[in-house]
Amino acid sequence: MAILKHIASKSSNYGAALEYLIFKHDELRKTPILDQNGNRIMRDEFYLDGLNCEPYSFDAACQQLNREYQKNKNKNEIKSHHYIISFDPRDSTENCLTGKRAQELGLEYAKANFPGHQALVCTHMDGHNGSGNIHVHIVINSLRKLDVPQQPFMERPVDCKAGYKHHLTKDYLKHLQKSLMDICMRENLNQIDLLSPSLSKVSEQEYYAKRRGQINLDLTNLELLGDGFTCLLYTSP
């Protein structure tokens, strides 16, 4: 099943997004993984493109646009939006989804749903937290660079104008979810109804807290095994 995740960021460091996309990171601690010499390690495989900017100058391009319109100056303003499309792990084996094709779908999705924005589109093959699924990151500057034709999903007249900010509402989010579902159906990929409310939702903070707890238990169990114990500790599901 393909799912869509959204993260809004108030950080003015647009370069951090690019660094995350191209370098290996510890997903739990949100820190880069370093080699024995203290250097960051490039991800094994990724596909990267820029929309309305060169991908490796995304930081400078966003800062320049912000200065031009005198926007995103307040520390409490949302500077960027990060959308993540996670495809079902079965799609790579059952439906022949490749990283190259996922990148093409991500570019199609970003162009259709975030027109006029500077954006990074990057596909990772390694999965999140060992899940093994192909996923696409779309990071956009919250400030729109170009005037674009008015689209049905745009709720305000200024939502198609340069110099105005990305405005995510519940209806817009539903449109984004439906857009992803439509692509998956067209491509014969595994998909669930994203518009149906989930019976059980876990926040990102709760998820990572549980993951860290499991890692600590794993370390404790290794110590117990080293001391000759055979009765190990477990967490409840």
Q: Which residue stretches match the model-derived regions?
A:
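N-terminal nicking endonuclease/strand-transfer module with a His-rich metal-binding environment
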Residues: 1-236
